[in-house]
Amino acid sequence: KETILENIKRATTLNVNQLISKIRNFQHQTTLPLTLENFISLNHISIETIYKKDSWSRLCQKAGVIDDFEQINEKQIYSAIGKKWLSTNSTSYFNFILQIAKQNFNIRISDFSENEKTMLLMVHYDVWQNAGDFDSLEKSINQIGKNKTLVKEIIEVLEILIDKIGFKEIDIELPYEQPLKLHARYTRDQILVAFRMSTFEKRSSNAIGVGVAENKEINTEILFIDLIKSEEDYSPTTLYDDYAISETLFHWQSQNQTRDDSGKGLTYINHKKLGKKILLFVREQSTNEFKNTNGYVFVGEGNFQEHEGSKPM
């Protein structure tokens, strides 16, 4: 057991020079072509370990196995893969990005449905991580395709991630269209785009750290839930007590200022009467073992059963 743990530790703490050396030596170990998938498989290295250091293409260039390539969009695409897509787990979303990547991101917005346009905006935020900066969403997506080496890398990464998914996504019925699926995992930014809180012109003010986000136009509130909370990430007043009681029952503690006799507290109690949708997005904890921010699993729609207390409820 100790040996296995030591091997895992060694594999996850490789430095850049060790990775580069392994890339150089790959051809001496096997007759397989050097691809990201073959490399991580042969060396028992996680894809996260690669992206803690650099993009796969840049590591290969530093190892002298591919020619140097232009740096256009490199920082943004490296960040999108390492910080966004490795925190996401969704067959439908990954397949959508894969499809446009295979067209070199050379898209025309008029070819897409409303739901697909929402996913294009999710991709925009994954890569550029901000609103605007382009005349249009179409131009923003087209720009991603300018670096051919990294487009090839995006395709390779997405195929690996799709292959790793071991669960079935399920559609959720809501009174409006949105592209997210039950059981899949998404970043906070992707969720805020899907529920129309972040637009092309303006990023939601809820993009950082608050446990709830509401869109009154579609009468929907999102609960962002961390099951394990560390005192580093939470103040004593926000260490809310959230946990599953059973497969169908969940204990959730509201924000501190929420009263049970007015305002938001009453909308929770009366949400069915008000036609308000309360959607649960849950993650184990804020970061994983690679210190990457975890995405949230779309658990589904919540239905109020009972409450006790006030401020918080």
Locate predicted features.
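Charged, low-complexity helical/coil segments in non-catalytic cytosolic or luminal regions
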Residues: L223-I225, D241, K264-L266
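Short, contiguous, well-structured surface segments enriched in hydrophobic/aromatic residues
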Residues: S246-H251, Q255-T258
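Short coil-to-beta transition motif at edge beta-strands of beta-rich domains
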Residues: G265-T287
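Polybasic, proline/glycine-rich intrinsically disordered low-complexity segments
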Residues: D261-Y268, E301-N303
